[in-house]
Amino acid sequence: MIPYPSFDKIAFEIGPFGSFGPLKVHWYGIMYLVAFAAAWFLARLRAKKPGSTWKPVDVDDFLFFRMLGTILGGRLGYVFFYGMSYWALDPWYPFKITDGGMSFHGGLIGVMVALAIFAVRRKRHIADVFDFAAPLPGSGLCAGRIGNFINGELWGKPTDAPWGFMVNGEGRHATQLYEAALEGVVLFLILWWYTAKPRPRMAPAGLFLIVYSLARTTVEFWRLPDSHLNEASGGYLVGHWFTMGMLLSIPMLLIGATLMFMAYRRRENSGNFSAVPA
């Protein structure tokens, strides 16, 4: 069993600045900066590929919209999917971002809306923009889950496995690291390889939905749910195994499979490349 080192959530402090401060910089905030920086770097690499129809200025605007969608959608998604009981008690709860609470599924919806607006403004096909974005989230998801691990949150079920972490005297699955590996590293490697050459329109976005949903659903079997969602069963929605994460991920799998089927049936050329998909 591995002892959990109990990290300080605050990475460092700056200041004070007169009567203000000091400014406390949290590890989770640093992970968000790492995620956005990685997305910018990877998007630039994609834009420089031979035959790409994307320019650096397109990437900068694209990432601005993506960042807004991630933050706003992630917070609102958490409130709607996981925090309605808190909102009922406190009407200002959605604005209390310092209390924590971000949802991947909410962030995904927010990003889709933001990128759709970007596509309309730039007169690009919405599916092409989604396809361009498909390989980018993996690095950010990995950074975010490492941030969860540093914060000591989102632990999994009790375990006596040698790779478990001893937390408050109890062995626990480090499901944050499982997700960092599957939703982060594995997702990124698969999508980066798949998008190395032109693919049919909608195929990269479809594959992203499939891989993420399978990875998330797998980890949900070891991850503890939010107990306040159904206190009678410890947070499980059905029985003692079906979670909110599964409920939100299964539709992603179905939509992703449908997009892949349609993509290879239609074989429309992607507007992201001037080459013809293989």
Regions from the language model: what does each represent?
Residues 1-278:
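A feature for loop-to-transmembrane-helix boundaries and adjacent hydrophobic helices
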